[in-house]
Amino acid sequence: MPTLSQLVKKGRQTLTEKKKSPALQGNPQRRGVCIRVYTTTPKKPNSALRKVARVKLTNGIEVTCYIPGEGHNLQEHSIVLVRGGRTKDLPGVRYKIIRGALDTAGVAKRKQGRSKYGAKNA
């Protein structure tokens, strides 16, 4: 507990809230280039091969992004649009690639929730 004179000299330091997606620097989306496209296994109770990509953003920051939906056309040097939003069972994956934007194709034969996967009306 600080004394009154210590508070007069220094004052209280306000706690800054931790950002959930710091690499976006306050922007809703950011463009980037795929460096590596690969699969990872999720945390303990789940089992799968999750599709992820290492992306270098336009601000120079490198992030790991999840590729949502079934099947994708991404490869090295693909230009992608990245948004915030973590994948709970993949540690360190705090971003998602937006389907149907730039080089990323939408999910084929998608009937429900099309807007989330960039699928056109068939």
Curated annotation (Swiss-Prot):
Keywords: Ribonucleoprotein, Ribosomal protein, RNA-binding, rRNA-binding, tRNA-binding. InterPro entries: NA-bd_OB-fold, Ribosomal_uS12, Ribosomal_uS12_bac. One of its GO terms (biological process) is translation. Residues 12-31 are annotated as: Disordered. It holds the Pfam family Ribosom_S12_S23. GO terms for molecular function: rRNA binding; structural constituent of ribosome; tRNA binding. One of its GO terms (cellular component) is small ribosomal subunit. Gene3D superfamilies: Nucleic acid-binding proteins. The keyword Transmembrane does not apply. NCBIfam families: rpsL_bact (TIGR00981). Belongs to the universal ribosomal protein uS12 family. With S4 and S5 plays an important role in translational accuracy. Interacts with and stabilizes bases of the 16S rRNA that are involved in tRNA selection in the A site and with the mRNA backbone. Located at the interface of the 30S and 50S subunits, it traverses the body of the 30S subunit contacting proteins on the other side and probably holding the rRNA structure together. The combined cluster of proteins S8, S12 and S17 appears to hold together the shoulder and platform of the 30S subunit. Part of the 30S ribosomal subunit. Contacts proteins S8 and S17. May interact with IF1 in the 30S initiation complex. This is Small ribosomal subunit protein uS12.
